[in-house]
Amino acid sequence: MPWKNTTMEFGAIAKLFHWTGAAAFIAAYAVVYYVIWFMDDTSPDALPVLNVHWVLGMIVGLSVLPRLLWRLVNVQPDQPHASHAEAWLAHAAHWGLYVLLILMPLTGYIGTDAATDFGAFALPNFRETALFGWIETRWGISWEAFEPPVDAIHHVVGKGIAWIVVALHVAAALFHHVVRRDGVLTRMLPGRSVA
């Protein structure tokens, strides 16, 4: 399998970004729903488990920039037999996914009042950063006023919009695979190559 994209398929790097991001995104959801369903999220016992959610979210968020750069410098596989409207919709849907992959980790980090511990180092909570200090000084907004709307965005998007966007992405991939039989799904599967 080539490491760069071709007009026929995604390369190994694009597939690695896709499946690593998907796995981290799904795992972050599994972890946070474990906390919601089986733990008291205000308990100190929940903090190490929530930290796993935060680390996974950071993996998703920090991988978006190199993923976008890789997408911009590589050719994208051709859209098979798509109308202008379908091609536009596919393009808009992919950029919508990128917005989601940025928005969820960003609002999650900003709205968390605890450090994210990666083991070898810890990322301070947003409240302790120079950026928030500047926001607080510049606009005179306290953490107590700043954090709740950001946290609300994270929860609304996470509990509703993200599920819809991901479900539409999976449904579109399955539509291409089952109905169209055009190879759109298989060209993103790991280990597959048209060559």
Please provide the spans of the model-predicted regions.
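Membrane-embedded alpha-helical bundles that constitute the cytochrome b-like, heme-associated redox core
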Residues: 1-195
